[in-house]
Amino acid sequence: MGKNWLTCVSVACLSPGKDKKNQKPEKPKRKWSFGKQKSRESFDFPLEETPPVDPSPSSVHRPYPPPPPLPDFAPQPLLPPPSPPPPPPAYTINTRIYGESKESKNRQALALASAVAAEAAVVAAHAAAEVIRLTTPSTPQIEESKEETAAIKIQNAYRCYTARRTLRALRGMARLKSLLQGKYVKRQMNAMLSSMQTLTRLQTQIQERRNRLSAENKTRHRLIQQKGHQKENHQNLVTAGNFDSSNKSKEQIVARSVNRKEASVRRERALAYAYSHQQTWRNSSKLPHQTLMDTNTTDWGWSWLERWMASRPWDAESIDDQVSVKSSLKRENSIKSSPARSKTQKSASQSSIQWPVNNDTKSRKIEVTNRRHSIGGGSSENAKDDESVGSSSSRRNSLDNTQTVKSKVSVETTSNVSNAQTVKPKANVGAKRNLDNTKTLKSKSSVGTTGNLANTEAVKSKVNVGTTSMPKKEVVADKKKPPQMVLPKKRLSSSTSLGKTKKLSDSDKATTGVANGEKKRRNGGSS
């Protein structure tokens, strides 16, 4: 049996096809194939006769028992035995025409050896499968089959799931490609790319600016620290006295240091002198608070500066002369401005020249100056000391006081002139109006103002009564007082108002008498 099966395999491998057999011998191809077929067929017959090439079943296959019948669930063999082909017809080949070559023999031998080896491998595989099937028991085969079927089902389900997922992914990719290929998507993508470019450009600019600002801040802080260290070093050198950073020369620096030393010495001397004078004032017989609280004295409420200025009458007289000159110039200007004013001023000047100076004002002025000299020191030595002590601040205060006095004198002169002009037409009207004016002047004179004095002076000049020079002389006497008496004047107004009102009342009586006499004359003339 094995011999017949091997011959069938060799014939199937080496024999030509049926179409080659049915071909006509006229064509050259058929001649070529026919020659090959003859050579092959001529080579087959002696192989069957030679014993080494023809394999016997005893040498190749071992005798095995027939296999038992397979159950229904057993797997079928992988390679079923091929059906033996029909035996080829016998051909008589003339071996003499076609010579056999050694190469063809070697090829045939190799082909037969390979075929035998393949057959042996197939038989060995079948035998191994049969041995395994026979040796394994029947029960575990059933359990393994269930597990295998379950694994197969699981694998099939998982493969289906993966296939569906891959299909879904492929469909999504196809849709995405179709969308990307559209015009709207292209425009959108271009716009997005341009905006992304601008955003990246802005971000880079902002980052560069931040880096630049941080670097500038670092350099600024470094410079500030360096300047601070330089200032500290400079201050240390200056405090130690080893360095002077000014751009001045050596002589200028030395002169500045000398001036500073002299100024410090002067300051110390002034402080020491002021302290010593404070002690002398405190140790005086009359305490300063007693003089301030004493209302009988004319220097009530003076400060030490006013007392010091009162002890310098020569300065006060020079200031009063300047004030009188300025007031006279202002009066001349006012006289030139209006003819009515010029007439009143001429009459007032004539009356003032004819009227003698009152001795009471002179005595009062002498008493006031004596008192001031007694309070301020009363001697020329104290005055000299005060001159040495007087600083720039005291001189400035004295100048300010003189300016205030000048302004007050100018205001008084202008008010006197204006009041004189207003009273003049009123005196020409009649006696009744003169009486009314005198009544108003009496009521105002109780207050002790300067306006009443001016009104009475104007009325007296109109009636040709020689009483107009007295108040003007009093004003001139008041002008000659020192400029530091501005504050005491306000406080002394209440004490001196009584004397002034008495004088005003006498002058008013005279004016009223003159007015009554004129009225009687008019009445007599009319009758």
Swiss-Prot record:
- Give TM segment ranges: none
Please provide the record's keywords in A-Z order: Calmodulin-binding, Coiled coil, Nucleus
Biased amino acid composition, Polar residues = 335-360, 399-422, 437-455
Q: Does the keyword RNA-binding apply?
A: no
Primary localization: nucleus
What are the IQ domain coordinates in residue numbering?
147-175
Q: Where is the composition biased (Pro residues)?
A: 63-90
Tagged with keyword Coiled coil: yes
| Compartments (UniProt record) | Nucleus; Nucleus, Nucleolus
Region feature (Disordered): 13-90, 323-527
Gene Ontology cellular-component terms listed: nucleolus; nucleus
Record's compositionally biased regions (Basic and acidic residues)? 17-26, 361-370, 471-481
Give the record's subunit note: Binds to multiple calmodulin (CaM) in the presence of Ca(2+) and CaM-like proteins.
This chain's function reads:
May be involved in cooperative interactions with calmodulins or calmodulin-like proteins. Recruits calmodulin proteins to microtubules, thus being a potential scaffold in cellular signaling and trafficking. May associate with nucleic acids and regulate gene expression at the transcriptional or post-transcriptional level.
Q: Protein name, please?
A: Protein IQ-DOMAIN 4
